[in-house]
Amino acid sequence: MAPGQMPHQPAPWRGTHPLFLLSPLMGLLSRAWSLLRAPGPPEPWLVEAVTEADQGGAGLEDEAKASLATYHALWGRHPQEETKDSGAAEEDREASPGACPNLEAKHSLPEAWGLSDDDDEKYGGEEATGVPREQKEFMDGQPAPLPLSLLIRSLPDLPGEEESKEEAVTGGGGNEVTAFSFPLSHWECCPGEEEEEEEENGEAVRVCRPVNGATEERTQTEAATKTSMSPSSVGSHLRAWECCSGKESEEEEKDKQAEKGDADPGPHFTSLAQRPSLRTWQHPSSAITEEEEDRDSEEMGASSSVPLTSAFLSDWVYQPEDTEEEDEEEEDCDSEATEDEGEAEVSSATPPPSAFLSAWVYRPGEDTEEEEDCDSEATEDEGEAEVSSATPPTSAFLSAWVYQPGDTEEEEDCDSEATEDEGEAEVSSATPPPSAFLSAWVYRPGEDTEEEDEYEDEDNESGAADLGPSPSLQTQSALLRDQIYQPGEKTDGGEAAEKWGEAESCPFRVAIYLPGEKPPPPWDPPRLPLRLQRRLKSAQTPTRHQDLERLLKTRKVRFSEKVSIHPLVVWAGPAQAARRGPWEQFARDRSRFARRIAQVQEELGPYLTPAARARAWARLGNPPTSLATVPAPTQTSPMTPIQATPLSHALASPSPPCVSPSLDLSGRRG
């Protein structure tokens, strides 16, 4: 093998293709792409394979060669491969005549679409092993093209033309001819059904055509079904791929069962297993009949390893045409299946999920009592059977969490009975019955009626003992009772009067005092409503008594005779910094100014007297008239030597008469 060549490994079409078939977007895109590319080259899935036994008809050979030449020119194939392929086809035809081995071994339906798997060799039978595997997969290092015996048509022809060509082909040879006509694209869900026609010479021709879905008439002989194994397998594959547009008749079902009984069960095992799983994904325009479901269940019963996917997917897929009766029948079937599994003690990997999914998936006709009874019976049967299943009964668990508008007291009774049966049974389930736990958390519309009344009655009985020793609280509550008006005061007032042993009080009373008559007794103090009284009894009365006792004990203030000093232990720096502020500076300035004022007054006080002023003017030589007339006062206070020195000096040294006072004042200090 060359280094650049890799073996052709086809994709596992059985596991992946049904998911692609379900995608409506891919189908729409492939349909649009096939319509756009209709004038261009054909796609691999647009091939119509027609195999001839004797390769008769030169016109067909020429047409096949021309179409193959265009196909090779577009897809990069070499004409050398054609000769090899034709030679291989002739050898295969000589090795196993009469069974179309070339179509079965090299170009069966999955391989024609490019979706074959490695396991397809087993389903072809002994006749499908005529060509070696290397020759099937590689021709000169490349995938083998279609042989010359296969007619390639680029565009689909009319049904009438196809029938005429098929008649011409069958008239030329004496062997069986198998023809396949595929839709424009393998993605579209075009109804294709098998149809068999019996010619005059007794030869059977099998054609796969797209039909609109009426009934099928099959007149195939037993010899034809035994000799041709691949058409039946291909038919079963095509049956799994198609989407039915109408109902199948009972004759078709009987013919299918007869063919499947004659054929080998080995190669058809996977196709039978795939059919119910694929049918559940389909959305037919009309509902599937009950006979088909029974037939599928019988086929699935033959192989225990295949899980019950029809019941699993039917709960998730919503079909608008299903009625309440069909839903009830399906649920009855599911409950019977669960009962059979519980009695047989079969530990299946996939348990029946109808009970689990029915609680989550909503259907239009679900809220009925029959379904609830069915669920309760299923849970009871599971509790009675001693089976340790991995999936416990979840209907009681989910019904407590999920709120449904039609929940009534009957559902609660059913849940309680189911939990009691589960408690009595010896089932080791991982999840205990949580209905009792969840019922306390989940709110339901009719819950707060009887339970609250019972709880309030218990509180009232327990609080009657607390109300006895405190009459003041009774009077206060009664006072508030008359002041507050409630719409239901009549019934509450009557109950309160019976409890307190007093007559019913009128809603409105007027006191009229007449002179000389005895005044009426005082009115009864008003009472609180019963709900408030219960709350006061349960919560407020014990706390109030404790508070009152504490207040009575700690009301009087006492001072001790011993005085104790507790020095404040602080740091010196932070304490001084806390005491500093602007007021300290103001105090310092105030004291400094007062000290300066006192000093100046002591020094300048004697010089400001009138006698000192007169002497000063006399010394200057021109005393004023006011000062001359005023006699000099006697010196009462002794003078300091500092003050007396300049005066004595001034008197001892007379000043010259011609000196101006300005110069005299400027040159002396005194």
Swiss-Prot record:
GO cellular component entries: endoplasmic reticulum; endoplasmic reticulum membrane; mitochondrial outer membrane; protein phosphatase type 1 complex
Positions of the UniProt region annotated as 4 X 34 AA approximate repeats: 355-511
Nucleus in keyword set: no
Membrane topology of the entry: Peripheral membrane protein
Keywords: Apoptosis, Endoplasmic reticulum, Membrane, Mitochondrion, Mitochondrion outer membrane, Phosphoprotein, Repeat, Stress response, Translation regulation, Ubl conjugation
Intramembrane segments: 22-39
Segments of skewed composition (Acidic residues): 191-202, 289-299, 321-344, 367-385, 407-425, 448-461
Biased composition (Polar residues): 271-288, 302-312, 388-397, 623-645
Chain intervals for the UniProt region annotation (Interaction with KMT2A/MLL1): 484-556
Phosphotyrosine PTM sites in chain numbering: Y403, Y443, Y513
GO biological process, one term: regulation of translation
Location, primary (coarse class): endoplasmic reticulum
Segments of this protein annotated with the region Interaction with SMAD7: 355-511
Taxonomy, superkingdom: Eukaryota
Region Interaction with SMARCB1, residue ranges: 537-584
Keyword Endoplasmic reticulum included in the entry's annotation: yes
Basic and acidic residues composition-biased segments: 78-87, 254-265, 489-501
GO MF entries: protein phosphatase regulator activity
Sequence repeats: 355-381, 396-426, 436-462, 478-511
Subcellular location: Endoplasmic reticulum membrane; Mitochondrion outer membrane
Residue ranges, annotated region (Disordered): 76-144, 159-178, 191-501, 622-670
Stretches assigned to the Cytoplasmic side: 1-21, 40-670
Family that this chain belongs to: Belongs to the PPP1R15 family.
Quaternary structure note: Interacts with PPP1CA. Interacts with EIF2S1. Interacts with PCNA. Interacts with LYN and KMT2A/MLL1. Interacts with PPP1R1A and SMARCB1. Interacts with SMAD7. Interacts with BAG1. Interacts with NOX4.
Function: Recruits the serine/threonine-protein phosphatase PPP1CA to prevents excessive phosphorylation of the translation initiation factor eIF-2A/EIF2S1, thereby reversing the shut-off of protein synthesis initiated by stress-inducible kinases and facilitating recovery of cells from stress. Down-regulates the TGF-beta signaling pathway by promoting dephosphorylation of TGFB1 by PP1. May promote apoptosis by inducing TP53 phosphorylation on 'Ser-15'. Plays an essential role in autophagy by tuning translation during starvation, thus enabling lysosomal biogenesis and a sustained autophagic flux.
Name of protein: Protein phosphatase 1 regulatory subunit 15A
Originating species: Bos taurus (Bovine)
